[in-house]
Amino acid sequence: MAGDHYFLELEPPEERLRTAPHVVIVGGGFAGIHACKALKDSDVRITLIDKRNFNLFQPLLYQVSTGLVSRGDVATPLRELVGVQRNVQVLLGEVTQVYPEGKQIVFNGKAYNYDYLVLATGSGSTFFGHDEWRTFAPPMK
């Protein structure tokens, strides 16, 4: 499925949104979902892009590993989180390049234009140059 992407258009945008500014939000984690919800009542078209079709609530992952919480309780579909918004389109895939001077991103090999870009791709763990620590200290955000 490399290179494939799926359009989960929640509802067709209203006519007034067809020419509204286009906001692209890359990342469906805490920051991306918050940005999306903050723009709910704005006259903008929002495209939310993530590699996964769900938001993972990482603070409860340890409870999944101990059996106190089921996997489904920590992974909420993006559609469920932003599905009530009429100005959102969710795309699944990966942004591989950003061209701020041309206001373009490359998503699954194709260029897309935007008016505003929100990069909310999250963070990763660092081992301060000691990758051998990764074996003994698996990251859990």
Language model segments and positions:
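FAD-binding core/adjacent interface of flavoenzyme oxidoreductases
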Residues: 1-20, 88-141
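Beta1-alpha1 glycine-rich phosphate/pyrophosphate-binding loop at the start
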Residues: 10-89, 132-133
